[in-house]
From Swiss-Prot:
CDD domains: MECDP_synthase. HAMAP family: IspF. Keywords: Isoprene biosynthesis, Lyase, Metal-binding. Pathway: Isoprenoid biosynthesis; isopentenyl diphosphate biosynthesis via DXP pathway; isopentenyl diphosphate from 1-deoxy-D-xylulose 5-phosphate: step 4/6. SUPFAM superfamilies: IpsF-like. Coiled coil: none annotated. It comes from Gemmatimonas aurantiaca (strain DSM 14586 / JCM 11422 / NBRC 100505 / T-27). It catalyses: 4-CDP-2-C-methyl-D-erythritol 2-phosphate = 2-C-methyl-D-erythritol 2,4-cyclic diphosphate + CMP. The keyword Coiled coil does not apply. PANTHER family: 2-C-METHYL-D-ERYTHRITOL 2,4-CYCLODIPHOSPHATE SYNTHASE, CHLOROPLASTIC (PTHR43181:SF1). Belongs to the IspF family. InterPro entries: MECDP_synthase, MECDP_synthase_CS, MECDP_synthase_sf. This is 2-C-methyl-D-erythritol 2,4-cyclodiphosphate synthase.
Length: 166
């Protein structure tokens, strides 16, 4: 008998660049900095994409959208996440829930949590109660504490399409 539920973990980090806004969780946060990257730098979408793909055994974001491909330069990370969700569905899986921890000194996540949850829930095809975004600081330690960038850890559960419970 095959498993009806799987779990995946995703991680991403980006250094900060000058100029805003900062794109996180599919929304723009007013800021004088942004997450530098080959795409739009949305570390939340990147970590969630990897968590989902990993749970389903479908590779990772770097395989789907290599940074060596010029077509991915500046790409909207929500589009990447939507593609991962489509791949998940094609393989017989659906999103169960997603739990996200953003490790950063700035920006503060709390004021933007509801908008991120709503945006991500729409993209993932789940209720907003199935998406949670937490913000944590690094207590001033290391590169995150020095406000050089941020890190994101995401955990996702996926369920076999057609299953409602375990």
């Amino acid at each position: 008998m095959s498993l009806l539920l799987r779990v995946g973990i995703g991680y991403d980090s980006h250094r900060f660049g000058e100029g805003g806004p900062m794109r996180l969780g599919g929304i723009d946060i007013p800021s004088d900095r942004h997450c530098a990257g080959h795409s739009d730098g949305d570390a939340i979408c990147h970590a969630v994409t990897d968590a989902l793909l990993g749970a389903a055994g479908l590779g990772d974001i770097g395989e789907m959208f290599p940074d060596t491909d010029a077509a991915n330069k500046g790409k909207d990370s929500v589009v990447m996440l939507e593609a991962a969700v489509s791949r998940l569905h094609a393989a017989g899986w659906r999103v169960g829930n997603v739990d996200i921890t953003v490790i950063t000194q700035q920006p503060k996540i709390g004021p933007h949590r509801a908008a991120m949850r709503d945006r991500l829930a729409t993209v993932l095809g789940v209720n907003s109660t199935e998406v949670f975004v937490k913000g944590k600081t690094n207590e001033g330690l290391g590169w995150i504490g020095r406000e050089e960038g941020l890190g994101v850890i995401a955990t996702a559960t996926i369920l076999a399409i057609g299953s409602s419970t375990l």
